[in-house]
Amino acid sequence: MIFIDTAEIIVYGGKGGDGAASFRREKFIEKGGPDGGDGGKGGDVYLVTDPALLTLYDFKYQKEFRAEDGEPGRSQKQFGKDGKDLFIRIPVGVIVADLETQTVVDMDKPGMKLLVARGGRGGKGNARMATATRRAPRFRELGHEGEMRRLRLELKLVAHVGLVGLPNAGKSSLISVISKAKPEIAPYPFTTRSPVLGIVKKAEQSFVVSDVPGLIEGAHEGKGLGLTFLRHVERTKVLAIVIDAAAIDGYEPMQAYETIIGELRAYNPNLLEKPRVLVLNKIDLLQPEHIDQLKVQFADKESHVVLTSAATGEGTNQLVDVLFELISPTLSTEEPTAEFMTMELPPLPEDFSIRREDEYWVVEGRWARYISRYDTTQPWDFQYVQREIRRKKLEEMLRQMGAKEGETVVIHDKAFEIL
């Protein structure tokens, strides 16, 4: 049984650390010169396939992921520490799509690693800004922002456990207790008309369980929901045969058990080769002596028998434990790969480009990003940026395009006013 599980997340590479603006000051050393160190690089963000994960459940509540920022540089030419990379674990078989560039990567092997957001470069300290004509720079570079990506993750889910039972055996109630599924529950046959998917989570592991439409006698001949139901069962890895132990549905427990086993055998004998557990449900409606009789009655029928009550929750934790035990051997044993890939962002324009956007003039490109490295709230940085703007003749180009005095120009992420 295959379902589609999806999630949308935002990932951020760590910001690079700011460079330091400092000067060497030691006794007996005159004009020690600039000694500000560079900032550390921001951490990268990777997606890594992990065969132990089966669903995208972990992304239901956490949508944003951010790698660690680089540390700022310090005096005495000390470089800041690089930020730690962030590794996000995903199930094998996830298709990763960049929502902006439409780049698609199929993560179909265990151990694959995909770089989805690079960390920003650390800013240069003033020790590295010195030149032959600028021997004592009082400014430094700010750290670069890390890349940001909006990603869509899509996983085709195979239901690992199929709940098999006659109508009104309590499958829907049971799946609502052991998972967060919300099936329609009512006291009449065939309440469930299509498969209901639930995700059962235990510690850091999870598996997918499906409550499929109720079985009736003659299903293998197409009666009731018949062949549709049995096709769903065929694709699961583990069967959980759910029986109404209180016989409210009119079938005595042993009669119900033999009916279900008979239908599975008639449709495909291989279904009985699957790992399975017998679930005797609704025990809250039984007297203790009746429960003991059921234990004896089914002791030699199945190696795994669990007595549960979806109404009170009794036995449901034991059921989850048994299902995990049965599922573990069926999980992928494929050898992990060391394959590494990078999801590239489109390159920035070589120098810079100018466009009008609402009330602003926007300057983009590599040069614009370069300008954003400087802290224009500091006088020395501001003077340097002004010199760069004049060198590029940006103001002249803006006026030629119709820019007027008093209008705002945004260079990457910094705003200036045309004078």
Swiss-Prot record:
GO terms for cellular component: cytoplasm. Mg(2+) binds at residues 172, 192. One of its GO terms (molecular function) is GTP binding. It comes from the Bacteria. Residues 344-419 form the OCT domain. Keywords: Cytoplasm, GTP-binding, Hydrolase, Magnesium, Metal-binding, Nucleotide-binding. Its cofactor is Mg(2+). Its EC number is 3.6.5.-. GTP binds at residues 165-172, 190-194, 211-214, 281-284, 309-311. SUPFAM superfamilies: Obg GTP-binding protein C-terminal domain, Obg GTP-binding protein N-terminal domain, P-loop containing nucleoside triphosphate hydrolases. PROSITE patterns: G_OBG, GTP1_OBG, OBG, OCT. Belongs to the TRAFAC class OBG-HflX-like GTPase superfamily. OBG GTPase family. Monomer. This is GTPase Obg. It comes from Coprothermobacter proteolyticus (strain ATCC 35245 / DSM 5265 / OCM 4 / BT). The gene is obg.
